A protein has these predicted regions:
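Hydrophobic positions on the long internal alpha-helix
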Residues: 4, 37-41, 55, 81-82
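Active-site loop-to-helix junction immediately N-terminal to the catalytic Tyr of the SDR YXXXK motif
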Residues: 18, 64-72, 84
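SDR active-site lid
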Residues: 91-159
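Active-site-adjacent segment of SDR/Rossmann-fold oxidoreductases
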Residues: 63, 84-95
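Substrate-binding pocket helix/loop in short-chain dehydrogenase/reductase
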Residues: 14-15, 22-24
Length: 189
């Protein structure tokens, strides 16, 4: 049995402007929705003695950027849940993996409203949004992401995290090093 959790919503803008309700909506979909679906399948997977759960997170789980803090917080929460669940469920032959793409052009970009230029932040959130949309729109080949999801779902020895970046992004070197350092340090404690 395989469950792939890929639902997500994203709001861009200053935290104080987006407000608590917006942050709660992001957590409801990105974290609690995934959590609920996952909890529905775990008993059946455990009963069958195997299973695979793949959570599509985001590089934003580790690389929070301005005007994206709420989204990053939800993806960080999902990454932590993914790693913890993988450790809990491994004895039952159930693996839980995360696939963390970096800014690909998906429907999440189409469903994200441009922030307002009104208020104390002026045009900064709008400029940031336009830059983000431009980068994402140039990355429409999702095959690296779907390949990572397929590997996470079917590889007998999957990685806990699949970091997926289009081409070569220097930031991924920093990202890979940070994740590896954190994992190595954790194993030593």
């Amino acid at each position: 049995d395989i469950l792939i959790n890929n639902a997500g919503i994203f709001s861009m803008g200053p935290m104080e402007v987006l407000g608590e309700g917006n942050l709660r909506r992001q957590f409801e979909t990105n974290v609690f929705g995934t959590f609920a679906l996952t909890n529905l399948v775990i008993p059946q997977m455990r009963e069958r003695g195997s299973g695979r759960i793949v959570n599509v997170t985001s590089a934003g789980a580790f690389l929070a950027r301005q005007y994206m803090a709420g989204y990053a917080a939800t993806k960080h929460a999902m990454d932590a849940i993914t790693i913890g669940l993988d450790l809990e469920l491994k004895p039952f032959n159930i693996r839980v993996c995360s696939v963390a793409p970096v800014q690909y052009g998906t429907s999440i970009a189409d469903n994200t409203a441009m922030p307002s230029a009104d208020g104390p932040y002026g045009d900064q959130p709008v400029d940031h949004y336009k830059e983000w949309r431009e980068i994402a729109s140039g990355r429409s080949d999702l095959s690296p992401v779907t390949d990572a999801i397929a590997d996470a779902a079917t590889n007998p020895n999957p990685k806990q995290r699949y970091l997926v970046a289009p081409g070569t992004l220097p930031i991924m070197d920093i990202f890979d090093a940070k994740v590896q350092f954190d994992e190595e340090r954790w194993k030593q404690t």
